């Protein structure tokens, strides 16, 4: 155990010193990684996050699933293909290093973190994720939007792009109504694109709950022009 890590946990004989942080990595350290998978709405980010968790869990690894501002409004990772999984909601006050240490204190392994909606993290959260990777050998896989409805980098996404070991654009292509690749997440209120308002306004690609608010993926040209096209059957699909 590195001396600074043992000291941080209260010495080599503390309860935490006996808990494997990431399998046998504490005895045989291996590099961990911070990876950011990004793409527009509807490209399958949350589905990929749950698949990643499944792949690691089936190999005997133990992880935590986290989210921030899921479309469900709860502490869940949900997908448009009907999959869902309980998750830990990342609040402004939550220290992610402290969260992992709490699990170690209870004798629970934490080999990896799955973080959905990571674009909405605070920069401080991302710094904590980097610390978990570098100092404690915990793998971190983040999934989220890169830009907001103004087509500006989200704070968490910006910091992830600055710190991540790998930045991966999800290859499922989402199309604008014109058929070109869509990369811009337009916020639509009352049938019109809006470019004003809070950065975070939880809604889906189909207006629900009596609120006339939704998001639509557009190509750059139609995003700039504010052109939504004619309503089509495709707008009613709920594929993630």
Each predicted region: which residue ranges?
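Extreme N-terminal basic, low-complexity initiation segments
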Residues: 2-8
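Short, Lys/Arg-enriched N-terminal segments with co-localized hydrophobic residues
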Residues: 8-29
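Conserved P-loop
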Residues: 26-103, 148-159, 201-202, 209-239
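Short loop/turn elements that form and flank the Walker-type P-loop nucleotide-binding site
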Residues: 31, 107-109, 135-137
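Residue-level preference for the first positions of well-ordered beta-strands
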Residues: 34-36, 62-64, 111-114, 139-141
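Conserved P-loop NTPase "ATPase switch" module shared by AAA+ and STAND
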Residues: 108-121
């Amino acid at each position: 155990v590195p001396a600074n890590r043992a000291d941080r946990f209260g010495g080599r004989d503390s309860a935490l010193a006996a808990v494997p942080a990431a399998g046998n990595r504490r005895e045989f350290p291996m590099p961990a990684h911070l990876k950011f998978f990004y793409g527009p709405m509807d490209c399958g980010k949350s589905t990929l996050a749950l698949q990643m968790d499944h792949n690691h869990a089936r190999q005997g690894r133990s992880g935590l699933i986290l989210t921030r501002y899921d479309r469900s409004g709860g502490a869940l990772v949900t997908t448009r293909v009907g999959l869902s999984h309980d998750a830990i909601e990342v609040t402004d006050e939550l220290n992610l290093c402290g969260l992992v240490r709490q699990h170690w204190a209870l004798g629970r392994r934490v080999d990896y973190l799955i973080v959905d909606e990571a674009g909405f993290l605070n920069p401080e959260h991302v710094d904590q994720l980097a610390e978990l990777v570098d100092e404690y050998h915990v793998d971190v896989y983040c999934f989220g939007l890169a830009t907001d409805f103004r087509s500006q980098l989200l704070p968490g996404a910006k910091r992830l792009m600055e710190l991540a070991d790998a930045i991966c654009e999800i290859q499922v292509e989402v199309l604008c109504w014109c058929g070109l690749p869509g990369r811009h997440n337009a916020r639509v209120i009352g049938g019109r694109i809006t470019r004003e308002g809070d950065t975070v306004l939880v809604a889906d690609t189909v207006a629900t709950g009596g609120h006339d608010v939704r998001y639509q993926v557009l190509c750059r040209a139609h995003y700039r022009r504010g052109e939504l096209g004619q309503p089509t059957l495709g707008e009613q699909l709920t594929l993630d």
